[in-house]
From Swiss-Prot:
EC code: 6.3.2.8
Keyword DNA repair annotated: no
Source domain of life: Bacteria
Catalyzed reactions per annotation: UDP-N-acetyl-alpha-D-muramate + L-alanine + ATP = UDP-N-acetyl-alpha-D-muramoyl-L-alanine + ADP + phosphate + H(+)
One GO term (biological process): peptidoglycan biosynthetic process
Species annotation: Francisella tularensis subsp. novicida (strain U112)
Pathway: Cell wall biogenesis; peptidoglycan biosynthesis
A single MF term (Gene Ontology): ATP binding
Family membership: Belongs to the MurCDEF family.
Primary role: Cell wall formation.
Name of the protein this chain belongs to: UDP-N-acetylmuramate--L-alanine ligase
Residues where ATP binds: 110-116
Gene: murC
Pfam families in UniProt: Mur_ligase, Mur_ligase_C, Mur_ligase_M
UniProt keyword Cytoplasm, yes or no: yes
Length: 451
């Protein structure tokens, strides 16, 4: 990749990964972001020049400009590049270009769990095949990075359905974790349009193998809609109708145990990640690795080393009002993700009271899923609800934090992190476990608990 490439919005997790990948594949790389952060510092340590002011960038020196979804079309650097006739590519479009440097690519998509599933597959393949690489939307704990380039053989990528940009990609293998109602503005608020986009993705000529979770209604709807016979389509899940069935799920000493029935063989596995949803995610990766020809024992040994991705069920021990308390930091921000996480906490800590501290993310999501929130938020023993993280949106009347808990009793409404800590200091003891959850800045609350 002998090109000069400027990455705009390089302080974000997705674009930073592409910048590193491009550099390791031989490109001359520079980046721009309006503010320096840990990711830009990492890029600078790798020898990538980072600009924080548009005035310092000579756009004419670059062959390609790659930009994140956070970069507006009116941004001066993007506008200048277009006026100069420089090729400008949205993040997913450049990922499609990057994929061409690899012999074989595996894409993970779905409304929930794609980052975790990508991290599981990346961790497995990096142990099973030293020439495997990955570019995912979170920090893979096994590698302490969101990117690894170990040659140009196999590439694991996270394919984003939220903006339909996965349609730019042409992988050989597709894993679909689930299909649910989120980011529906992308699909004109039409479930059928959403399904059609997934159908278009798996129908690409490059795709040879497709793995879908048959426990999920959306995946079942896709299976009913998709009727091409020229691809290897495998369903997996706890359902007796799955091609690869999961069974004997249980937890011993905080380790998840389960078995799968694969082509007539009963195979047992252990996993550090909690919850049935993570067993489903891991099973998709196991099947893909088995179908690639890797040995069961090698996969089994590699799986127990999988530790997931940052901010997905991260475990901490905090001292709160003199009590040692388990605190879990999690990125979940959709009713399905909330319900799955609370179920996983319940499975792992069956004798403890669950205190759920939740920060809703986006008023539009609150509004669009208003009927689904109360059931999910009722599953913990105690709910502490924070103000909604706006992510730049204007307040929508009837879609604020108290509105998504309509009909619930006994929950506590905190006006900020300090107020939430006040509640936790009154409620927490050795018999409680605290789940702090949301896609905004609520992770900062975890650090505040140690102060």
């Amino acid at each position: 990749m002998n090109k000069k490439i400027l990455f705009l919005g390089v302080g974000g997790i997705g674009v930073s990964a592409l910048a590193i990948a491009a550099k390791r594949l031989g490109a001359h790389v520079a980046g721009y972001d309006s503010a320096a952060n840990k990711l830009t510092a990492k890029l600078e340590a790798l020898g990538i020049v980072i600009f924080t002011s548009p005035s310092g960038v000579d756009v004419a020196n670059f062959d390609i400009v790659v930009y994140s979804s956070a970069i507006l079309s009116s941004h001066p650097l993007l506008s200048q590049a277009r006026s100069l006739g420089i090729q400008c590519l949205q993040r997913a479009m450049f990922l499609a270009v990057l994929m061409k440097d690899f012999s074989y690519s595996l894409a993970i998509t779905g409304t929930h769990g794609k980052t975790t599933t990508s991290s599981v597959l990346a961790t497995l393949l990096c142990q099973l095949d030293k020439h495997s690489s990955f570019v995912v939307g979170g920090v893979v704990k096994y590698a302490d990075s969101n990117i690894q380039v170990n040659g140009t053989d196999k590439l694991v990528i996270e394919a984003d359905e939220s903006d339909a940009s996965f349609l730019f990609l042409s992988p050989q293998v597709v894993i679909i974790t689930n299909i649910d109602l989120d980011h529906m503005a992308t699909y004109n608020n039409s479930y059928q349009t959403l399904l059609e986009n997934f159908t278009d993705f798996v129908s690409k000529e490059s795709v040879k193998s497709i793995y879908l979770c048959v426990d999920d209604q959306g995946c079942r709807d896709l299976l009913a809609k998709y009727n091409q016979s020229d691809k290897n389509v495998t369903s997996y899940g706890f359902s007796i109708n799955a091609d690869v069935q999961i069974y004997d799920y249980h937890i011993i000493d905080e380790i998840t145990h389960f078995k799968i029935r694969y082509k007539g063989d009963d195979l047992s596995f252990k996993l550090q990640l909690p919850g049935k949803y993570n067993v489903q995610n891991a099973t998709a990766c196991i099947i893909a690795c088995l179908d690639l020809g890797f040995k069961y024992e090698d996969i089994r040994n590699a799986l127990i080393k999988v530790t997931g991705v940052a901010r997905r069920f991260d475990l901490y021990t905090k001292v709160i009002s003199g009590h040692q308390v388990t605190v879990i930091d999690d990125y979940g921000h959709h009713p399905v993700e909330v319900a799955n996480s609370i179920s996983a906490v319940r499975d792992r800590y069956p004798n403890k009271k669950i205190i759920h501290v939740f920060q809703p993310h986006r008023y539009t999501r609150n509004r669009d899923l208003i009927k689904d929130w109360p059931k999910a938020l009722s599953l913990a023993d105690q709910l502490i609800l924070l103000p909604t993280y706006s992510a730049g949106e204007q307040i929508i009347k009837g879609a604020e934090s108290q509105d998504i808990a309509k009909g619930l009793s006994g929950y506590l409404l905190a006006d900020g992190f300090d107020h939430a800590i006040y509640f936790l200091e009154k409620l927490a003891n050795e018999n409680t476990v605290i789940l702090i959850q949301g896609a905004g800045d609520v992770t900062n609350l975890v650090e505040m608990l140690s102060e």
